[in-house]
Amino acid sequence: MAELTPMMRQYLEIKERHPDCILFFRLGDFYEMFADDAKLASHELDLTLTTRDRGKEKSEQVPMCGVPYHSAESYIARLVARGYKVAICEQMEDPALAKGLVKRDITRIVTPGTVIESSMLDESRNNYFACVFGEDGRYGLSFCDISTGAFYATQAEGAEAMERVISELGRFAPAEVLHGGDAAKSEELTRTLQERLSCCADLGADELFAPQETAQLVEKQFGKPLDELGLTERPEVWRSAGALLRTLCELQKTGLSHVRELEFYVSGRFMELDLSARRNLELTETMRAGEKRGSLLWVLDHTKTAMGSRMLRSWLEKPLLSPKRINARLDAVEELTKNSIGRDELVHMLQDVSDYERVTARIVTGAANCRDLVSLGNGCEPLPELRAAIGGLHASMFGVLLDELDDLSDLRDEIRNAIVDEPPFSVREGGMIRDGYSEELDQLRDIVSGGKGTLARIEAEEREKTGIKTLRVGYNRVFGYYIEVSKGQTAQVPETYIRKQTLTTGERYITPELKELERTILTAKDRITALEYELFSQVRQHLADQSARIQRTARAVAALDVLTDFAALAARQNYCRPEIDLSGELHITDGRHPVVEQVLKDALFVPNDTALDCGANRVAILTGPNMAGKSTYMRQVALIVLMAQMGCFVPARTARIGVVDRIFTRIGASDDLASGQSTFMVEMTEVAEILKHATSHSLLILDEIGRGTSTFDGMAIARAVLEYAADKKRIGAKTLFATHYHELTDIEQEIEGVRNYNIAVRKRGADIVFLRKIVPGAADDSYGVEVARLAGLPDKVVSRARELLRALESGAPVRTVRVAADDQISITSMENDALRRKLESLAIETMTPIEAMNALFELKKML
């Protein structure tokens, strides 16, 4: 193999340290990729694949492709979105000043969980990197969003530990997960990461989770001993947190000084929602299309700031269990709901607030440019007015927010004094610092501007001295400043001119005076560029030192934005304040589905009442036809409960919500082909999880249990599940149970606490009208054939279905009907059909005309 060039040797040495990354290797104005990286990148990014000499003898070529450094971000984003890791290798010194090969090193590794660039992130959601570590049946979970500085940790233990691990991962929806210890051995977790969470999963080496090292990392990062963090007796948590911190530091290279607070929480603080419940209730995206539109988040999120949008999603993912904390939010929402003028003023102010959290993260990590600083400065403008507005509000939560919210006027002024209003994108090319900010910079700029005046003076003097009227002074990068004289006038050039270049149209010369001026101007320009970067870096570092203030203000502004949004929604949609307590009761008057009523727009949504408690009204059996609205109603109840525990007003006339610890759903069915499970197996697995984990404080939404198997098997399973859920000694949870098994309605007479309800239907001849109203009692019919007709089944199929239904209801055997060539049903084939039997029983010979007409009318009714 040919001897490597110094640059290729340098590349391979760096690549060897990061074999799992695509290496973006900076060469001048480009990031280049070589060998296998180049082949992969050219395919993924549609780049032209070329070659470069690998060795000095030029006998061996290596594949190469590249992207301009100023547009690299978009290419990196595409690679990271597809799950690749990208290592950024920068030039660590100015190539013009380097002696020999330019020094290069990795400055950052970009992975799905470490993105901080605004163009690569969804501003409305956090971008979490998670870590799960397990030992002896106990698991520690940590979640960090380095784009905002948020850091959470929790634990899971006992028989339900893995279920809780998966539930928490579903709550945070991380972009990347690191797992180690017992967590790395869990097939269930591995399958969930791959199939249900669709996130990038990394296996952590055992040494990454070493107890002593991880404990020290956690204490150093958060500035507190483990006991003050509440982690002394939770080694699996600090080992998870420490491993995550170490991984992030290795990837970021610049440290995590903006990650200041570890928020440890326990399972009793928030409502539990498993992956099925989140999916079935369509909290953040719809089940079919995976879109925000049509989800609960779509209804709720009209926040004015990116920070508020992220906090609202967090509140949605973590509904509260404490009535005190819920009511504190509701008090604030109520005050703003009643104060429309104050609310509108807040909305107007919030529109001008920038994303402090993510700008601060870029500042601290050294990734912020001048435009980020200007955005931060401009975004601070509304803060004094926001403080004044909050000061006039009375709810206790506003007092807390006022204490947290800093007007940041000193930082705003510093940015405005230092940075021009419209700075360039690059921080290495000058043009950033405002005149008057630095005396030295102003002097250098005077030299450059004065030098331009001097050049004009020299040009005028030389024309006068030589008598050459077309003489001009110019500049190019090769020769610097020069005097150009046209060909016909070169005889007039004085001997003091030094010829540098011959052109077809003339000659170019230099003079000692011109070269001295050139050195002065170019030296000043270089110094200006370097000094501007120094001054910018000083401002950025000072802002980084103040990042704690900015982050506190960001959290306060985000909470204010969410509360204002909730109030505006309540006023706009006529929501009511729910009464929150620990009674276990669930009483809703004229409740509405928050999403459906907005999707319907002009159509009238029919409201419904709900009455559930832990006693005589524990279970509501809901019967009625498909398409009548059973599933919508049950989801509606669950969403109202969830919204109430977020601290939001709810779509109802009145609502009393006894706090619910978990919401379970079994709605819909689909095969899990990836794991080889049938519809019925998926259904039974989910039901088993519900019955295992539900408590008397839970809300169960069970739709069509048992429909995936035979009628009698399904009915038996549905009844057994219903009895188990209703039994106070086992669960006794508040339950909405929709079923087509009308035989189950008899349970109302057998088990205390079970009540029958149905969806009211009105028949108009052969047509049915769904009234969408929940009324007491069992349904008298499922109207399945009528629903099939409404769905558009062919008339012949519907007619045949009616015949078969009548035969089944009468207990007569059913046989296949032979079809004639003209598609008409053959009367001779209907040997046991009810219509045939009726015809055979008629004594036509003895009938009067009136009797014949009546008989014909009866026969027509049988069709």
What feature does the model see in each segment?
Residues 1-335, 348-364, 368-460, 585-587:
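Charged catalytic and DNA/RNA-contacting regions of genome-maintenance
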Residues 4-8, 24, 31, 35, ...:
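Amphipathic alpha-helical transducer elements in NTP-driven molecular machines
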Residues 29, 456, 463-487:
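Extended, charged helical/alpha-beta scaffold domains that provide interaction surfaces
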Residues 365, 382, 396, 400, ...:
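Charged, surface-exposed helical/loop "interaction arms" that form contiguous linear patches used
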Residues 476, 843-849, 853-863:
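Terminal-proximal interaction/regulatory segments of ATP-powered molecular machines
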Residues 503, 507-541:
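Extended, charged coiled-coil "arm/hinge" scaffolds of SMC/Rad50-like chromosome-maintenance ATPases
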